Amino acid sequence: MSRPLQITILGATGSIGLSTLDVVARHPDRYDVFALTGFSRLAELRALCLKHRPRYAVVSDQAQARILQDQLHADGVSTRVLDGEGGLSEVAAHPEVDVVMAAIVGAAGLKPTLAAVQSGKRVLLANKEALVMSGALFMQALRDSGAVLLPIDSEHNAIFQCLPTDYSQGLGTVGVRRILLTASGGPFREMAPDLLSDVTPEQACAHPNWSMGRKISVDSASMMNKGLELIEACWLFDARPHQVEVVIHPQSVIHSMVDYVDGSVLAQLGNPDMRTPIAHALAWPERIESGVSALDLLRVGRLDFQAPDDRRFPCLRLARTAAEVGGTAPAMLNAANEVAVDAFLNRRIRFTEIASIIDDVLNHEASVPTVCLEDVLAADRRARDVAGQWLYRNGR
């Protein structure tokens, strides 16, 4: 038997990271944990290092690194602790690493994910923001390095499974009419739009089907998550925005579909558990056991579908517009959303003001073509500044 694959998990203390470790632990003959990163959750990262004994761990700064290194030394664990952006990129691009799970939430995950791609790794992409922000540059780096990119978002993983292997030649050439991107609709799917201004962070984070972190839970509630996924799908599958249709499917059993010109529609179904796409991407093109129970269709009983309401979910409309504009617009959309969601979670703004901030940023800053990574990062900074100015002007 060949040696176990060495895996780095960027964002190990988050929900995707923990689910990845759960799957990896079921297959010790196939995978070794090489590095774990967890910027702000020192106690959780220490516990993971005690359990999985990685060669490296990465935290946010030197002070935290010293604390964790001393703790692990006292624990008798030989893990070496690195820090900062440089540490993240080092463990993502390390020559001994085979697989990188890119699960850092938000723009912070862009540079290490890009480092993994440029180093030719098998990259399991859960950090959708990396593609949203730098799509053209990211895909060019992928082509140049020969890296393998496998989507972890349940929707994109489903689309990947439903497409023919040669889809990169163009969706039209392989008979694809459109991609049907499913969405649960989140906790506010049936709420009257005029009541949304009073919802709390706790309500927004109470997703009906999925267990997720706070930021992505708010994105799901606003359907910005689906907007980001629409942009990601365009880059992953070489689709135009009009070829990606969002469909609300409350049960979250069908994870997405592909509609072909002959009238066939292929769908991927499964229980709403992220270990399924994680296991699929880890083992692809093989299959491994994930710990997810078999889907009981008789218990599900029914599958419902409806169109999203733009009045209830303006963030989805804003994301589609950014996808159509292109250039730095998606990066600015993402940055404005990150600022707005953080403000909402800290009770500085109302839920409905998330879209107001994003709209203000996109109207204030013109999109420009992205020639290099600095173009993307500069657009990100400008958008955050404008979003911060909105908060200041409105006394938040």
UniProtKB/Swiss-Prot annotation:
GO BP terms: isopentenyl diphosphate biosynthetic process, methylerythritol 4-phosphate pathway involved in terpenoid biosynthetic process
UniProtKB keywords: Isoprene biosynthesis, Manganese, Metal-binding, NADP, Oxidoreductase
Domain of life per record: Bacteria
Example GO molecular function: NADPH binding
Gene3D superfamilies referenced in this protein's UniProt entry, alphabetically: 1.10.1740.10, NAD(P)-binding Rossmann-like Domain
EC supergroup of this enzyme: oxidoreductase
Record-listed NADPH binding positions: 13-16, 127, 129, 213
Annotated binding of 1-deoxy-D-xylulose 5-phosphate, by residue: 128, 154-155, 184, 207, 220, 225-226, 229
Biological or metabolic pathway of the protein: Isoprenoid biosynthesis; isopentenyl diphosphate biosynthesis via DXP pathway; isopentenyl diphosphate from 1-deoxy-D-xylulose 5-phosphate: step 1/6
Pfam families according to UniProt: DXP_redisom_C (PF08436), DXP_reductoisom (PF02670), DXPR_C (PF13288)
Chemical reaction(s) catalysed: 2-C-methyl-D-erythritol 4-phosphate + NADP(+) = 1-deoxy-D-xylulose 5-phosphate + NADPH + H(+)
Record: residues binding Mn(2+): 153, 155, 229
Cofactor(s) annotated in UniProt: Mg(2+); Mn(2+)
EC number: 1.1.1.267
UniProt record similarity statement: Belongs to the DXR family.
Described function: Catalyzes the NADPH-dependent rearrangement and reduction of 1-deoxy-D-xylulose-5-phosphate (DXP) to 2-C-methyl-D-erythritol 4-phosphate (MEP).
Name of the protein described by the UniProt record: 1-deoxy-D-xylulose 5-phosphate reductoisomerase
Organism field: Stutzerimonas stutzeri (strain A1501) (Pseudomonas stutzeri)
